[in-house]
Amino acid sequence: LRRVQPGAFTGSAVESVTLFDNLQQISDYAFENCTYLRTLHINAATAPVYSGSYYATFADRYDRLLSLESTQKLVLFSGSSARFGYDSAALDAALPSYAVVNMGVFAYTNALPQLELIRARMREGDILLLSPEFDAAKRQFCTTNAFDDDFFCMAEANYDMVAELDLQQYSGVFSALGSYLQTRAGMTQSSYAVSPSDLDEDGNAVDTPSYNAYGDYVLYRSDAADDTPIYGLPVDYTTAAFPYDT
């Protein structure tokens, strides 16, 4: 199967769809008015392209979360503010009754599906600590239910995560998948054997792991030369300063 045409399943009673990541074309128009469709299974038919990148850390983090499902835990979440900003070992030492997992990867993808995956693995007494990023407020505060291709980038190392989400709670799923597949088709293939901890943030091989078991990026990163906002945004953290288009 290479293409799923617009209207292919319009109005059908399909409940679950299984696709492969060598698909070339698909969009939401193929599944309009499919009110029973809840589950998307994706199987890997091609080599990964995001192995070694920060996207691929999400699957590792999720594996740790799964391993702690029955354990009282502290879950750290956001984008790179969590990935770079926490010392999970220090939190672990200060809160010995909680196991720590750092789920933060990338602020510029919708937090909603990530938080739904996390919520399903949390139990009474667990703690979720958010550190939302100012310039990605719309995505970080779940103001939309729309999927984006970056989420699929993060799911590439474990497509089974996608199948855990109820598609009726989201919009734009298949169009985002189509965008993701078109982009990766033109990228250099890698291998699942390549771990993000083998590389630094710029893709260079490192002698010591760049990520620890908690999910923290632990290589030294120098401070910025000044406090000028990277995206040119004011940093007074008032409601007037929040960008309307993020």
Please give the residue ranges for each predicted region.
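A general structural motif
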Residues: L1, L37, T71, E124-I127
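Structural signature of tandem-repeat unit edges
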Residues: L1-R3, G11-Q25, T35-T46
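Flexible, charged surface loops at secondary-structure boundaries
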Residues: T10, L66-T71, A120-R123
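N-terminal secretory targeting modules
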Residues: A45-K73
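Acidic/glycine-enriched edge-of-secondary-structure segments
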Residues: A47-S53, A99-G104, A241-D245
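Membrane-embedded segments
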Residues: L76-L165
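Secreted/periplasmic serine-hydrolase-like ester/acetyl group-modifying domain
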Residues: A146-T246
